[in-house]
Structures are given as C-alpha cells and as structure tokens.
C-alpha cells in the first residue's frame, strides 16, 4: 500500500516496526531513505490508503480481503500504523469483532469455520496436483521469508527479518527481557537483535 501511495517500487520503502508477538506497529516510514513518517501517517489518517484498498477491491466480496478500515482507525487513534492487515489486527481487539455495526463500518470481513475448512481442502489439493504434473509449479518468488531465513542459517550470511526476541533495547519503552517483535539479524549462530533498529514512543 505504501508503495502505491508514494508511487514507487516496494523495494524503495523501508519501515521501522515494534510491538509484541504478531501485534506490531510501523513506527517510521522511509521512501528512498527519506523520512516520510509524518506525511504517510497523515495521508493514511485522511483515508487515502482506505480509498485505494476499496477501489482495488471494487465490489470483491472475498472475506480474506483487507480494506484498511481498522488500520486507518487505529493509526488515527494511536499515531502508529498496525503492520498487519485488518483481519489479523482485529483478533487482538475483539470489541470490534463483537459489534456488528463496527464490523460493517470498518468493513471487517469475518470467515466461518466452514469456509476455512473449504480453503484448507483446496490448499491441500493444489500441491498434490503439482506433484502429479497437473498444474505447473510457480516459479515467481514467494513473499514468505522462510527461504531467506533457512539460507541465512545454513550459509551464515546475515538476513534481516522481523522476529520475536527478548528485548535488548530494540523497544526502549518496554522492559529489557520482554519478548518483542522487531527487526533482527539471522545467520548461522541463530537470531539476535539488530542494534540499529530501535523504537520508542513519540
């Protein structure tokens, strides 16, 4: 979304993040190494990201779509941007899920257990079709970072990823030793905090 807002490639966007397990927040935004945090958060709070998401969705009823309703709201309330999509963030804030009017206002899409079972069956069958040669194996790079992590731990070359580690100063407002989710360095000796990535409340 940030790359669309700033009309640039995803690789030109860098962020700092901080939070607790799976509930992390973008604290700083950079485009081509220029700090655009204030502008980015202002534009998000003004609804730009939500408008883009709704336009992209264009009537799509897929319950797995994120339309930026909750993220926009929370950015306005707290001054930071939730890093995960609405569907994941709302799991930490059940009040939004319980209230049907709030779900509708923010376009929070919930999924039934039956739909999850259907998706699981489809997602299990697809690799089987690939193994049987009935469907080509995708060759484009996945957005998942596990291959980079495995390669770093095998080769010893550093890979910087978002990880859960004991706080060693990455989040200055939280107690040392508390498990926090921030950028960390992974290599042959494991995962450790990145001393260059620290965040605190503004």
Question: Over which residues does each language-model region extend?
Answer:
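Long, compositionally biased stretches enriched for glycine and/or charged residues
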Residues: 3-202
């Amino acid at each position: 979304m940030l790359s669309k807002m700033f009309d640039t490639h995803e690789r030109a966007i860098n962020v700092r993040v901080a939070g607790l397990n799976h509930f992390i927040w973008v604290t700083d935004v950079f485009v081509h190494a220029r700090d655009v945090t204030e502008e980015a958060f202002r534009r998000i709070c003004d609804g730009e990201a939500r408008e883009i998401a709704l336009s992209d969705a264009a009537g799509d009823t897929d319950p797995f779509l994120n339309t930026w309703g909750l993220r926009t709201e929370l950015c306005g309330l707290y001054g930071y941007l939730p890093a995960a999509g609405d569907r994941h963030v709302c799991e930490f804030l059940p009040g939004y899920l319980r209230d049907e009017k709030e779900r509708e206002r923010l376009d929070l899409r919930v999924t039934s257990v039956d739909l999850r079972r259907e998706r699981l069956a489809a997602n299990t069958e697809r690799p089987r079709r690939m193994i049987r040669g009935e469907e080509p194996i995708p060759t484009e790079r996945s957005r998942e970072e596990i291959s980079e992590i495995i390669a770093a731990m095998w080769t010893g070359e550093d890979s910087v990823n978002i990880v859960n580690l004991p706080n060693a100063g990455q989040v200055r407002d939280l107690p040392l030793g508390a498990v926090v989710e921030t950028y960390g360095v992974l290599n042959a000796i494991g995962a450790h905090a990145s001393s260059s990535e620290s965040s605190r409340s503004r």
